[in-house]
Amino acid sequence: MRTAVVVALLGLGAFAVAAGLVLQLHTYPLLAKLQHNINTTSVSEGEGVTAVVYPPGGVPEIRHGLRVTATTHVEGDLAAPEIKKNGDVTVWKRATIVKEESAKLVLSAEVRRICLDRRTAEAVAPCHGEFYETERGKRITAEGRQLLQPGLNFLFPFDTEQRDYRWYDTVLKKPVDIHFDGEQLLQGLDVYRFVHTVPPTALERLEVPGSLIGRPESSVDVTRYYRVTRTLLVEPTTGAVLSVREDIRQELRTATQGEGEGTAVFNGELRLTNASVTANADEVKKNLPKLFMITTLPVALWVLGAVLVAIGLVLLFLHRRGLVAGALALVAGVCLAGTITYGVTNASSPDSSLDLKNVVSSTNVDYGLR
């Protein structure tokens, strides 16, 4: 009997090590990918905001104490040529509209389309049809292998690290460093906090009505400046951004004005609503068990395999009193091996239910109006 137990322990030990390798080398690349068919909506809100508004038929004016909402819709462009089952690139489009709630006036809007590496979440090129548009009819498109919106745009990579990343700022139109700032708990999830501050930065020169900045002239030359402090809470295993807070100031300065002396055309804080944060957290909680199997479990399997092999070797040199411990280890090994086998065989790609044969182009995403 001892010989049978020894052989079984050695076999299970080898199986556990092999299963760990399968999870790490096969199942991880299969599951740890951004989905093609994303379709989400989130809302950010701000109270007491100062902003320039554009009344219908009137002239732009500065209003204070506004309640502002920013609605963002993200969906996958399944008709894009880059989309392939189990491929490494996906294509997402994002539409955002910012409104002042009392009069339902639109303050700003944008539409973006971008190709993403499904593992790192970074923008990639070439990307057929990549663009951004912040004014209707004035679309900026990528040419050739140009990377129009580099860096991270929507998410962080799987297994996010405690280090700096490059986050694309849609106002600056370029990526900026965002810094790891600590850990905290959010709705039962351990998250990483990333923060950066963009100092007041000149964006463009404009000619605006003098009345907008309290001047008697019919028009005045000004420069628009932008500053933001952005805080993102990221679930590190999935790279999902669960919460966003942005303290934003944009002001118009004349040639003689310094920092803080200009006219604020947007000043306030926008943060993701509790409902949106909860929806993000619930989605992560649904996916974490799958990813646990392919991140933590391989290490446990390697350790278990080594222990089982060690027990088997020890039993080769022990008498019958070692058989009880060996039998218990064997039973534990069989149970765990069965669990692992079930998990590996039932792991499915996020593309397994995706139908790419009858998709219709979704180019109608329009300024978040869904």
Go through each PLM region and give its residues:
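Juxtamembrane interface at the cytosolic side of transmembrane helices
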Residues: 2-8, 290-347
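Membrane-proximal extracellular "stem/stalk" segments
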Residues: 214-315
